[in-house]
């Protein structure tokens, strides 16, 4: 997955993020096996320890809550630990991973363009409708909402032929 923010460096790890997840990368000094690591991901806390050296790499309260059941970690070549945290409330930037650590300026993050296929069905339909209506307005044509209002008005006029709408004004 491509990360939308630049790589951010902390004392013991680097991290990057998208609006929905954060990925931490930890370079271990000496190769270890996964059983040599203690990694505990709670909804609001992260602990990473090297059991061989008894070194605590990370132990702190997360910036915001995560979906604990979706989070995971992998160890590559015994030296590269990667932890993926899925944000409980997506569609937001985190200024840090662990509270109290140095923070980044989230207003400086330049997200990548997203594709309509990145959205769930309901959101995608809403975005497609907005784009369609924007295009219609640019062409001087009525939007879907304006067309619907006009259709309802025409139906009402047909159901009430005895009413005079000649001087009616609508915005």
Curated annotation (Swiss-Prot):
GO terms for molecular function: unfolded protein binding. GO terms for biological process: cell division; karyogamy; protein folding. Keywords: Cell cycle, Cell division, Cytoplasm, Cytoskeleton, Karyogamy, Microtubule, Mitosis. Residues 8-98 form the CS domain. Pfam families: CS. InterPro entries: CS_dom, HSP20-like_chaperone, NudC_fam. GO terms for cellular component: cytoplasm; microtubule. It is found in: Cytoplasm, Cytoskeleton. CDD domains: p23_NUDC_like (cd06467). Belongs to the nudC family. Required for nuclear movement. May interact between microtubules and nuclei and/or may be involved in the generation of force used to move nuclei during interphase. This is Nuclear movement protein nudC. It comes from Dictyostelium discoideum (Social amoeba).
